[in-house]
C-alpha cells in the first residue's frame, strides 16, 4: 500500500511531528523520516500510480519514472544529510519548515498533472520563505520578504500559464511543450524565476546567505533543482534555454569573483551551475538531458557540502566574510578538507562527481556541433575553479593567519560533511553508479 502514497506525505508528517516531539524522539524523526522517504521513493512504480477526477480533469498526484525517481532520491538524500548536519544546532521550527520545504520538492518530482505540480510548487515557496526568516536577523527578515515577493510573482506567472494551457488543450497532464504562445511562455518564465535565471537572479544571492548556517544548506538544494526537473519534463529542447543558461553561467562567475561574503560566493555559484543545466535542457538531446539530470544530482551534493563547510566556519567563528577569515586549516582541518573536496567537485576535477557529470553536458554540445557553446562552457569551468575552487577555500582556510582558533565542527556537522564528501568521491571514482540510474 505504501507505493500508492506520495513519498512527500512522509516528510510532511515528519515536519508536523518535529514540532510535537523533543529529545531523542525528535532526533529519530529527523534522521529516520528521510530514510523512510527514500524507501517509499523506490517503491513507486513507473507510470501513473494514483488518479482521481476533479472538475472534469484527471488529477495524477503520483506518477513514477526514472527521471522523477532520480530527482526524488537526491532530494531525500539531501534531507537526511541536512537533518544530520542541523539537528543539534537548528531550532525545531527551522527543521520543521525545512522538511516541509523538502516535501514540496519531492511532491513536484512525482506530480503527474499541472494542478498537483502547482500546489507543491507553491508549498515549496511558502516553507522556503520561512526557512529564510529562521535566520533570525533583521537582514534575514528583509531578505525573506523580498524572497516571498519574487516567488509570489513567479507563482502568479506560472498559474496564468497553466490556466491558459489547460483551457486551450483541455489537459492538465505534465507533458513536453514548446514556448510558442502566451501561455507556454508564462509557464517557462515562471519556471525560470525559480531557476534564478536573468533578469531576476538576485533573489537567490540576496536570500540564501541571510538564512542560518543550517538553513542555507537546505536552501541550496531544492528550489533551483526542482526548476531544472520541471524544465526537463516540460521544455526539453527549447532553444531559448541555451542562451539563458550561458548567460547564467557567466553572470554567476563574474559576481562570485567580486564577492567577499563566503556564502554569497557560493550562492552566485549556484546560479552559475544551474546555468550549465539550463543550457543542457536547451540542447535537448538524450545525452544533454541526462547530463542536466546527472549534474543536478551531483550539484546538490557538492553544493550542500560547500555550504556545510562555510556554515561550520560561521557557526564556530561568527564571521562570514573572506577578509575576516584565514588560517582556519590549523584548527578546523576536517571542515577544511571537506570544503576542499566540495571545491574540487564543483570545479570538475577528475575523480570527483562534478567531472563525472559536467563532461556529459560538454559532450552533448560537441555532439551537436555547438562549437561556441562548447568553448563557453569550457571557459566557464575554468572560471568556476577560480571562485569556488580557489577563492573560497583559500581565503577561508589558508591565506593569512586571521588569529582565529576555533574548534572544528561539532560531530554531527562533521558526520554530514564526511558523508557528502564520500558521495562526491564515490560518484567521481565509480560514475557508473550514477549513470545506471539516468533516464
List the model feature ranges, each with a label.
Residues 1-3, 234-240, 439:
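Membrane-helix interface and helix-disruption motif detector
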Residues 50-56, 360-364, 433-439:
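Membrane-interfacial helical/loop segments at transmembrane boundaries in membrane proteins
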Residues 81-96, 102-117, 127-412, 423, ...:
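Hydrophobic transmembrane alpha-helices and their helix-loop junctions in integral membrane proteins
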Amino acid at each position: 500500500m505504501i507505493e500508492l502514497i506520495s513519498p512527500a506525505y512522509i516528510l510532511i508528517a515528519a515536519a508536523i511531528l518535529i514540532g510535537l516531539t523533543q529529545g531523542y524522539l525528535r532526533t529519530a524523526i529527523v534522521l529516520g523520516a528521510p530514510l523512510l522517504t527514500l524507501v517509499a521513493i523506490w517503491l513507486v512504480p513507473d507510470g501513473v500510480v494514483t488518479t482521481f477526477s476533479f472538475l472534469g480533469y484527471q488529477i495524477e498526484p503520483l506518477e513514477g519514472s526514472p527521471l522523477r525517481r532520480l530527482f526524488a532520491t537526491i532530494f531525500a538524500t539531501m534531507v537526511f544529510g541536512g537533518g544530520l548536519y542541523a539537528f543539534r544546532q537548528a531550532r525545531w521550527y527551522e527543521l520543521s519548515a525545512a522538511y516541509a520545504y523538502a516535501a514540496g520538492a519531492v511532491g513536484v518530482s512525482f506530480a503527474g498533472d499541472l494542478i498537483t505540480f502547482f500546489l507543491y510548487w507553491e508549498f515549496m515557496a511558502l516553507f522556503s520563505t520561512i526557512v529564510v526568516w529562521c535566520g533570525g536577523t533583521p537582514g534575514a527578515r528583509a531578505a525573506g520578504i523580498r524572497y516571498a515577493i519574487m516567488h509570489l510573482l513567479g507563482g502568479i506567472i506560472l498559474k496564468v500559464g497553466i490556466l491558459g494551457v489547460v483551457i486551450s488543450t483541455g489537459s492538465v497532464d505534465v507533458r513536453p511543450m514548446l514556448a510558442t504562445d502566451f501561455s507556454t511562455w508564462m509557464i517557462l518564465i515562471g519556471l525560470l524565476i525559480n531557476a534564478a535565471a536573468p533578469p531576476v537572479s538576485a533573489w537567490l544571492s540576496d536570500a540564501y546567505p541571510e538564512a542560518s548556517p543550517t538553513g542555507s544548506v537546505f536552501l541550496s538544494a531544492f528550489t533551483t533543482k526542482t526548476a531544472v526537473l520541471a524544465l526537463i519534463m516540460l521544455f526539453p529542447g527549447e532553444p531559448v534555454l541555451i542562451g539563458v543558461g550561458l548567460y547564467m553561467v557567466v553572470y554567476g562567475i563574474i559576481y562570485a569573483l567580486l564577492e567577499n561574503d563566503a556564502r554569497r560566493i557560493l550562492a552566485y555559484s549556484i546560479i552559475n551551475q544551474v546555468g550549465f543545466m539550463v543550457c543542457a535542457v536547451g540542447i535537448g538531446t538524450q545525452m544533454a538531458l541526462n547530463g542536466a539530470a546527472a549534474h543536478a544530482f551531483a550539484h546538490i551534493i557538492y553544493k550542500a557540502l560547500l555550504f556545510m563547510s562555510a556554515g561550520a566556519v560561521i557557526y564556530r567563528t561568527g564571521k562570514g566574510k573572506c577578509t575576516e577569515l584565514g588560517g582556519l586549516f590549523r584548527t578546523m582541518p576536517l571542515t577544511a578538507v571537506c570544503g576542499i573536496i566540495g571545491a574540487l567537485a564543483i570545479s570538475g576535477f577528475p575523480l570527483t562527481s562534478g567531472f563525472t557529470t559536467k563532461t556529459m553536458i560538454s559532450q552533448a554540445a560537441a555532439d551537436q556541433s555547438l562549437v561556441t557553446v562548447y568553448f563557453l562552457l569550457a571557459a566557464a569551468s575554468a572560471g568556476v575553479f577560480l571562485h569556488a575552487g580557489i577563492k573560497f577555500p583559500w581565503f577561508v582556510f589558508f591565506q593569512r593567519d586571521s588569529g582565529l582558533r576555533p574548534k572544528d565542527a561539532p560531530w554531527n556537522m562533521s558526520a554530514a560533511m564526511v558523508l557528502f564528501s564520500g558521495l562526491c568521491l564515490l560518484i567521481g571514482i565509480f560514475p557508473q553508479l550514477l549513470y545506471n540510474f539516468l533516464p
